């Protein structure tokens, strides 16, 4: 698959329209209240960039780009038909996991070499541990380091990571529409998660989305990268006291955003 291909399935990807949020909400109301098929078509065409962003993450699997694009469009159409405006969640946040799910099913059903569910679970747990160890030690962990944390044989970690072909960073963005990017980490399923936990996670993302750039940066460095207030202060050129004050204000504002 080529990242530079312009025409996919007869669609000129260099000229795809982009819908503004308010325009998108209006089209969804027309579709849901009036059954307007033209509104549905506009929503599909206006969100094809989502499909393009997702299929670029599967470019090393030897699949035809046209096939992946068509499968991704099926996921997009399903997300359009099932999207609920009342949840007050950005459409891209809802659609991207559905597009990824549709493509994963296609790849699973068409892959001559099936990877067992247990092996995939080990591989993705290993990726999570890898990212945590990098955050804690600032260096790349060995397969043996990861195996010790997960309490599984070293060979099993190596085999599991090889089996999923192209392990990527959990913090690699899958889609970015100018706001907060959607990361690989966001799409790794956890069977322990309930629907209520999923809704809480979406609420947290929406609450953080409304913070200013500096507040977002401080919270990411503190809680996602595990840095101390002093380390953050040195990186952005302010005092530790200022970081502490900004952090508290950001958390307070985020809590207010969530409960509005």
UniProtKB/Swiss-Prot annotation:
Descriptive protein name: RNA polymerase sigma-G factor
Keyword Transcription regulation attributed: yes
Feature: DNA-binding region: 229-248
Positions of short motif Polymerase core binding: 67-80
InterPro entries attached to this UniProt entry: RNA_pol_sigma-70_dom (IPR014284), RNA_pol_sigma-B/F/G (IPR014322), RNA_pol_sigma-G (IPR014212), RNA_pol_sigma70 (IPR000943), RNA_pol_sigma70_r2 (IPR007627), RNA_pol_sigma70_r3 (IPR007624), RNA_pol_sigma70_r4 (IPR007630), RNA_pol_sigma_r2 (IPR013325)
Quaternary structure and interacting proteins, as annotated: Interacts with anti-sigma-G factor Gin (csfB).
Sequence similarity: Belongs to the sigma-70 factor family.
Keyword Transcription regulation: yes
Top-level taxon of origin: Bacteria
Location of the region described as Recognizes anti-sigma-G factor Gin (csfB) in the Swiss-Prot/TrEMBL record: 1-71
Annotated keywords: DNA-binding, Sigma factor, Sporulation, Transcription, Transcription regulation
GO biological process, one term: sporulation resulting in formation of a cellular spore
CDD domains registered for this protein in UniProt: Sigma70_r4 (cd06171)
Gene induction: Expressed and active 2 hours after sporulation starts (at protein level); stimulates its own transcription.
Cited PROSITE patterns: SIGMA70_1, SIGMA70_2
């Amino acid at each position: 698959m080529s990242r530079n291909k312009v025409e996919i399935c007869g669609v000129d990807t260099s000229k795809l329209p982009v819908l503004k949020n308010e325009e998108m909400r209006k089209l969804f109301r027309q579709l849901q209240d009036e059954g307007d098929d033209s509104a549905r078509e506009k929503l599909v065409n206006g969100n094809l960039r989502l499909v393009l962003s997702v299929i670029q993450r599967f470019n090393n699997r030897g699949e035809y780009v046209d096939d992946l694009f068509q499968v991704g469009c099926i996921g997009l159409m399903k997300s359009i038909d099932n999207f609920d405006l009342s949840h007050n969640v950005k459409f891209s946040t809802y659609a991207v996991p559905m597009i990824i799910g549709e493509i994963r099913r296609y790849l699973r059903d068409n892959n001559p070499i099936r990877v067992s569910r247990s092996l995939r679970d080990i591989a993705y747990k290993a990726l999570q541990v890898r990212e945590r160890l990098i955050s804690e030690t600032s260096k790349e962990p060995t397969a043996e380091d990861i195996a010790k944390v997960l309490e599984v044989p070293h060979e099993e970690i190596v085999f599991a990571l090889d089996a999923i072909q192209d392990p990527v960073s959990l913090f690699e963005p899958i889609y970015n529409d100018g706001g907060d990017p959607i990361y690989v980490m966001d799409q790794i399923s956890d069977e322990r998660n309930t629907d209520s936990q999923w809704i809480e996670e979406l609420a947290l993302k929406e609450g953080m989305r409304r913070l200013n750039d500096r507040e977002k940066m401080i919270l990411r460095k503190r809680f996602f990268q595990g840095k101390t207030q002093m380390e953050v202060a040195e990186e952005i050129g302010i005092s530790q006291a200022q970081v502490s004050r900004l952090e508290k204000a950001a958390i307070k504002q985020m809590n207010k955003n969530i409960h509005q």
